[in-house]
């Protein structure tokens, strides 16, 4: 459980400038107001939430029976798994190398996978860019990711970006302190304000770290933002939570019904009640032999058995809930544990996944713009220039993504072959390798292998030409390869 913060205590921190107090107070208030709802959604994602029982069909002795439904996690992970960031591309080779280094030093691909799950859980996540201390082994630029449980921001509608933001950097992890925040960073257009609270103290102390970026070094990853909701919405919507509660209650009802259906209900007509009262309800329920005597009139009690109940209504209702959940989240119903008696065709499987693929394409487009701004901020911090100066160079930076449709290698190779036959010059482009599913690192290795193979072929041609005194093609290139080998 994550404890919140006290807005007034932080807004009156020692050393905090008067002109920044209202901004800090607003940020802390937003964080506190949204924390409970974000923790609730995290609870559904982690399957820690128990639904409210209706008190109709569940006996009191079984109302605490726990059932976990992973549908909210599936709603998040099914989309997150199709959003695979694969670095940046840039027409400027020097900038491309810088960005590759930044991505590698910050493990940004792995960090993005974590951030996108937080984004889909809570509607948004945040990336921050700060300068690292290279003297202690840190990278020149540090890119950090925070979920909405640890961060909040104020939106500037006119500039279409964050006006100011707050992140919880560190917490008190000692027992009985409930993860209380001890270090908070506030990001503004001119400064990073470190506000810390020493352990066992109630006073906060502010420290200013000015930067010359001219903008807040914090960027949101937002899912389905609208004009009214600039920070988007969660994949775990109210409908998802309600359906999950209903599914858990249905699962409990099915569990209870299954226990009663293991032995059909029996009855005795005309038996002495005192004889039956000697048996407990459980013994009467599971007992296979009844011993009863005739009544005073000499009549023998009539034994009977009720028709055994069916689990089909429970199965049908769970299938109905899964269909509604699938419609709400675009997750194929087959991924929710509902198996069809008739196998689906390849076309039907693709059609079921198409809405989720479209969601992933939209998600990648939105996150691609955010990651581009993060890349520009990282370059500005690394070069110690303003954000405007980096923009003035007009670097053509774009985020690169794996295909969210996740086609098979065979089908993708077949489609790319047809494209190359129609447009032959594409065969010389790296895009062909990317579309075939090769990662950025694999593309670089393939290009290195190709260059070495070309050099070896040129050397063989040179030696063959000397033996036969025949001129060789690409003599200038060959001389360059030989010179490079001598220098190496």
Where are the regions a protein language model picked out?
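Charge-rich, acidic-biased intrinsically disordered regions
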Residues: 13, 21, 135, 139-143, ...
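Extended, compositionally biased alpha-helical segments that mediate assembly or anchoring
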Residues: 447-488
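Extended, charged amphipathic alpha-helical segments
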Residues: 204-351, 400, 404
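Extended, regular secondary-structure scaffolds
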Residues: 113, 120-121, 126-234
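Membrane-proximal bilayer-interacting regions
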Residues: 406, 415-422, 426-446
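Short linear loop/turn motifs
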Residues: 338-345, 438, 442-456
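Extended, helix-rich architectural segments
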Residues: 1-145, 462, 478-488
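C-terminal amphipathic alpha-helical
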Residues: 109-123, 127-128, 254-259, 310-409
């Amino acid at each position: 459980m994550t404890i919140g913060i006290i807005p007034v205590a932080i807004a009156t921190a020692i050393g905090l400038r008067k002109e920044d107090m209202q901004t800090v107070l607003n940020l802390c208030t937003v964080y506190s107001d949204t924390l409970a709802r974000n923790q609730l959604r995290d609870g559904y994602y982690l399957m820690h939430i128990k639904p409210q029982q209706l008190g109709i069909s569940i006996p009191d002795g079984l109302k605490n029976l726990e059932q976990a439904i992973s549908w909210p996690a599936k709603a998040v992970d099914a989309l997150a798994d199709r959003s695979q960031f694969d670095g940046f591309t840039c027409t400027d080779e020097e900038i491309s190398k810088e960005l590759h280094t930044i991505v590698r030093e910050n493990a940004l691909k792995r960090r993005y996978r974590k951030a996108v799950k937080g984004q889909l859980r809570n509607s948004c996540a945040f990336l921050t860019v700060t300068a690292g201390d290279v003297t202690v082994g840190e990278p020149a630029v540090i890119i950090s990711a925070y979920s909405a449980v640890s961060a909040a921001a104020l939106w500037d509608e006119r500039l279409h970006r964050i006006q100011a933001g707050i992140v919880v950097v560190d917490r008190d992890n000692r027992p009985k302190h409930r993860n209380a925040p001890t270090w908070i960073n506030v990001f503004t257009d001119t400064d990073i304000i470190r506000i810390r609270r020493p352990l066992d103290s109630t006073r906060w102390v502010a420290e200013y770290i000015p930067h010359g970026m001219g903008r807040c070094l914090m960027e949101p990853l937002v899912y389905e933002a609208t004009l009214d909701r600039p920070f988007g919405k969660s994949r775990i919507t109210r409908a998802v939570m309600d359906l999950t509660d209903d599914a858990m209650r249905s699962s409990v009802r099915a569990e209870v019904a299954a226990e009663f259906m293991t032995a059909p209900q029996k009855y005795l007509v005309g038996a002495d009640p005192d004889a039956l009262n000697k048996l407990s309800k459980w013994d009467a329920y599971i007992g296979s032999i009844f011993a009863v005597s005739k009544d005073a009139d000499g009549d023998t009690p009539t034994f009977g058995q009720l028709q055994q109940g069916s689990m089909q209504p429970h199965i049908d209702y769970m299938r109905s809930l899964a269909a509604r959940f699938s419609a709400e989240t675009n997750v194929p119903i087959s991924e929710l544990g509902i198996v069809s008696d008739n196998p689906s065709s390849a076309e039907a499987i693709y059609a079921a996944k198409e809405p989720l693929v479209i969601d992933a394409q939209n998600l990648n487009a939105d996150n691609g713009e955010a990651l581009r701004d993060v890349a520009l901020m990282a370059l500005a911090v690394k070069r110690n220039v303003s954000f405007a100066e980096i923009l003035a160079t007009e670097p053509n930076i774009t985020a690169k993504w794996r295909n969210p449709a996740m086609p098979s290698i065979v089908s993708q190779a077949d489609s790319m072959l047809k494209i190359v036959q129609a447009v032959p010059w594409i065969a010389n482009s790296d895009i062909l390798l990317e579309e075939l599913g090769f990662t950025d690192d694999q593309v670089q290795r393939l290009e290195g292998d190709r260059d070495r193979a070309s050099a070896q072929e040129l050397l063989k041609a040179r030696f063959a030409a000397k033996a036969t005194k025949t001129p060789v093609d690409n003599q200038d290139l060959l001389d360059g390869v030989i010179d490079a080998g001598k220098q190496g």
